[in-house]
Amino acid sequence: MWDPFGVVAFFENLSQLTGIQIDQITFITVQITALTIAPTFQSLLHPSKASPALRQIVSLVLGVIFASTCFGRQLLHLFFLSTVSYVLLKTVNPLRVQWITLIVTLSYLSLMHLYRLFFEYASYSLDITGPLMVAVQKLTSLAFILHDNIHIKKNVSESNNHIKKNGSESNKVTYKITSVPSLLEFYGYMFNFQTLMVGPLVFFDDHMEWVNGENFTKHKLQANGSSTKTDLFQVLFRLFSKKLQQVLLLVCCMLV
């Protein structure tokens, strides 16, 4: 197995010692490591201390390290699909790019599932199809949001007339992406170490709010004396509880 960071040998010894499959040990270790590293983005890499570019780069590098540790060269599938989708976003008409991106990404993911069905049937080992499913959600949501914003921008006069006549904002969109992200923003989003392995899906706008440190300042709680620390505690509590459920579920599967 590809071992660019010299950790596979350690996990192989640990697997022999515990009797647990190496891919399961690696996955649990990576998830726990990601949880322990995440708070540094609120301390050492706080938006007031680190630039958005630095936060993107660190998150991207960690994502690549974690994914390559778990999946080895299979990580190239994720990079290939992301790159193809980025080229589509840059070259295809924005009014049609959402459907083309959906077809391409789902087709590639389906081929990966079919490959596993025919050549690795009844295999319970973890593979790159998990992160690929998360990637398909990210790529298609990005393409559809880009299309929606450009379509509404193109028909802004019609939308304004409709609002004036009916008193509603039926064409209002929640996420505003009017141009294709830069390469750093795109790959930083796709390979974010917190969502790369098993999700959850985070929309591009939400990711950029986190990168720029706007996720707490923009979404303030109601004026009830709550502070940012309260928000952070709630987020961390929910995050750890969800990850703990995932780890416990995986452990139960290993014991069955």
Where are these regions (language model features)?
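Membrane-embedded transmembrane alpha-helical bundles that form the catalytic cores
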Residues: M1-V256
